[in-house]
Amino acid sequence: MKRSMYAGRVREEHIGTTITLKGWVSRRRDLGGLIFIDLRDREGVMQLVINPEEVSSDVMATAERLRSEYVIEVEGFVEARQQANDKLATGMVELKVSALTILNTAKTTPFEIKDDAEVSDDTRLRYRYLDLRRPEMLENFKLRAKVTHSIRNYLDDLEFIDVETPMLTKSTPEGARDYLVPSRVSQGHFYALPQSPQITKQLLMNAGFDRYYQIVKCFRDEDLRGDRQPEFTQVDLETSFLSEQEIQDIVEGMIAKVMKETKEIDVTLPFPRMSYDVAMNSYGSDKPDTRFEMLLQDLTVTVKGIDFKVFSEAPAVKAIVVKGNADRYSRKDIDKLTEFAKQFGAKGLAWVKVTDGQFSGPVAKFLTAIETELSSQLKLAENDLVLFVADTLEVANNTLGALRNRIAKDLDMIDQSQFNFLWVVDWPMFEWSEEEGRYMSAHHPFTLPTPESAHELEGDLAKVRAIAYDIVLNGYELGGGSLRINQKEMQERMFKALGFTADEANDQFGFLLEAMDYGFPPHGGLAIGLDRFVMLLAEKDNIREVIAFPKNNKASDPMTQAPSLVSENQLEELSLQIESHD
């Protein structure tokens, strides 16, 4: 029989009609001779009633066989429920069953198919097809579909062209580790799965496409955390002849449309703009969460002359003030914060509390001479807790930025209903890598430097600034973009600044440099992490909740057991040998 509608969409207007429904048995109950079935499909749950006095013995026998997650087809008459269930969208009606067919049986599931089931992450991933039956998960993917639909409509209306770029591409340096794919035809050679379509989308601008977009899968072999996966999806844009501001206007319009259509939220445009330096110095992060205060305070000058060398001789001394919550933190609690601070390079964490109008704590005695000045500068009040870090500016910022976020969560200081977007601009072009012992691109080596700082490509690389912009939402980097280099001479200077010889640059990027000989237009763009965006809209804390078949924190799939061993024949065909490092 043809299904009449989704079970979760039956309403009062259907009372008095005969319909056919198909779905899964969510629950079966026997009460006073009647059998009640909760039938679940992707749109919700509908109550079925099977009365032995009104159905055949065959139907009754079939009903008695039903167990959770059996797949069934039913026909029946829609009636008003005697006792409405306000918790269900279908709670005003029920289906009086006249015909019942079992379409498939099911084993007992390893966990209950309900939103509040307590189950480990790996078990959820091992039985992902069951996990995805939970209503909450279905809603996540409906939301994701709405987001992508909204984005496509918006960009189509602006005459962006949707173009697919290659999945098998060339491995290039200056990024995370590539996933490599050996070539059977060209033995000893490898493709790389793209970390982004960066170069190919730039080449599309050279081809005259003018406006490109793609919702594209990307791959990075990097350590995982809650907002990262080895394969992820991004909304990728590139435009020709537009300024930084024009590109940002397009992106803001796209996000405003998504927010309105998926969350019914009117966001204020334009988004605030914050320089990279302000973000780091005031928030201790290049992706600041602006839903709460507790800004970093620079005390380096204030403490310079005191008789406490830890402070007076430190390159930088900075602090955050936990307002009105000193009594929430015992010595043991602060010790935990100290251990947390050490993860970010700090040697320790100094602190004082304001108790009965005076400083108390291990370093209070060293601050007596400047207590009044500090109190004024930090605007201290009774029961405030001050946390200090004395170290390099970078360590002080990073440590206090991380503490700021942790404490805000611990004290429930964040308004979870807010969606605070902002642009972080005026980025440094390079960042120093202790591991590599050299400067590396803060974004990528195709970013255009500012005209005022480009001369430092042959001088002090720390002074080179980029025409780059990151879009931040609630403390997460949502995406990043820049204007790109379109002049060959500038691109060669950039490669040289990064330590490439001319031969190395030509070997890795010769095709791009050659393309710059053929009228490459000014261009720029941006990419937004779709998984992360949907995660935040769904108010989840892990992107696994919005990816259908994600990997775990070991980059493996407990369901398919990927990655897996392959046969010797397959390795031989690729001229590969596996060496053990045990």
Swiss-Prot record:
<feature type="binding site">
    <location>
        <position position="443"/>
    </location>
    <ligand>
        <name>L-aspartate</name>
    </ligand>
</feature>
<dbReference type="InterPro" id="IPR029351">
    <property type="entry name" value="GAD_dom"/>
</dbReference>
<dbReference type="GO" id="GO:0016740">
    <property type="term" value="F:transferase activity"/>
</dbReference>
<dbReference type="InterPro" id="IPR004365">
    <property type="entry name" value="NA-bd_OB_tRNA"/>
</dbReference>
<dbReference type="Pfam" id="PF01336">
    <property type="entry name" value="tRNA_anti-codon"/>
</dbReference>
<feature type="binding site">
    <location>
        <begin position="220"/>
        <end position="222"/>
    </location>
    <ligand>
        <name>ATP</name>
    </ligand>
</feature>
<dbReference type="InterPro" id="IPR002312">
    <property type="entry name" value="Asp/Asn-tRNA-synth_IIb"/>
</dbReference>
<feature type="binding site">
    <location>
        <position position="229"/>
    </location>
    <ligand>
        <name>ATP</name>
    </ligand>
</feature>
<comment type="function">
    <text>Catalyzes the attachment of L-aspartate to tRNA(Asp) in a two-step reaction: L-aspartate is first activated by ATP to form Asp-AMP and then transferred to the acceptor end of tRNA(Asp).</text>
</comment>
<dbReference type="InterPro" id="IPR004524">
    <property type="entry name" value="Asp-tRNA-ligase_1"/>
</dbReference>
<dbReference type="GO" id="GO:0003676">
    <property type="term" value="F:nucleic acid binding"/>
</dbReference>
<dbReference type="InterPro" id="IPR004115">
    <property type="entry name" value="GAD-like_sf"/>
</dbReference>
<keyword id="KW-0067">ATP-binding</keyword>
<protein>
    <recommendedName>
        <fullName>Aspartate--tRNA ligase</fullName>
        <ecNumber>6.1.1.12</ecNumber>
    </recommendedName>
</protein>
<dbReference type="InterPro" id="IPR012340">
    <property type="entry name" value="NA-bd_OB-fold"/>
</dbReference>
<keyword id="KW-0547">Nucleotide-binding</keyword>
<keyword id="KW-0030">Aminoacyl-tRNA synthetase</keyword>
<dbReference type="InterPro" id="IPR047089">
    <property type="entry name" value="Asp-tRNA-ligase_1_N"/>
</dbReference>
<dbReference type="GO" id="GO:0140096">
    <property type="term" value="F:catalytic activity, acting on a protein"/>
</dbReference>
<comment type="similarity">
    <text>Belongs to the class-II aminoacyl-tRNA synthetase family. Type 1 subfamily.</text>
</comment>
<dbReference type="InterPro" id="IPR047090">
    <property type="entry name" value="AspRS_core"/>
</dbReference>
<feature type="binding site">
    <location>
        <begin position="529"/>
        <end position="532"/>
    </location>
    <ligand>
        <name>ATP</name>
    </ligand>
</feature>
<keyword id="KW-0648">Protein biosynthesis</keyword>
<keyword id="KW-0963">Cytoplasm</keyword>
<dbReference type="InterPro" id="IPR045864">
    <property type="entry name" value="aa-tRNA-synth_II/BPL/LPL"/>
</dbReference>
<feature type="binding site">
    <location>
        <position position="477"/>
    </location>
    <ligand>
        <name>ATP</name>
    </ligand>
</feature>
<feature type="binding site">
    <location>
        <position position="174"/>
    </location>
    <ligand>
        <name>L-aspartate</name>
    </ligand>
</feature>
<feature type="binding site">
    <location>
        <position position="220"/>
    </location>
    <ligand>
        <name>L-aspartate</name>
    </ligand>
</feature>
<feature type="region of interest" description="Aspartate">
    <location>
        <begin position="198"/>
        <end position="201"/>
    </location>
</feature>
<dbReference type="GO" id="GO:0005524">
    <property type="term" value="F:ATP binding"/>
</dbReference>
<dbReference type="InterPro" id="IPR006195">
    <property type="entry name" value="aa-tRNA-synth_II"/>
</dbReference>
<feature type="binding site">
    <location>
        <position position="484"/>
    </location>
    <ligand>
        <name>L-aspartate</name>
    </ligand>
</feature>
<comment type="subunit">
    <text>Homodimer.</text>
</comment>
<dbReference type="GO" id="GO:0005737">
    <property type="term" value="C:cytoplasm"/>
</dbReference>
<dbReference type="Pfam" id="PF02938">
    <property type="entry name" value="GAD"/>
</dbReference>
<dbReference type="GO" id="GO:0004815">
    <property type="term" value="F:aspartate-tRNA ligase activity"/>
</dbReference>
<dbReference type="GO" id="GO:0006422">
    <property type="term" value="P:aspartyl-tRNA aminoacylation"/>
</dbReference>
<dbReference type="Pfam" id="PF00152">
    <property type="entry name" value="tRNA-synt_2"/>
</dbReference>
<dbReference type="InterPro" id="IPR004364">
    <property type="entry name" value="Aa-tRNA-synt_II"/>
</dbReference>
<keyword id="KW-0436">Ligase</keyword>
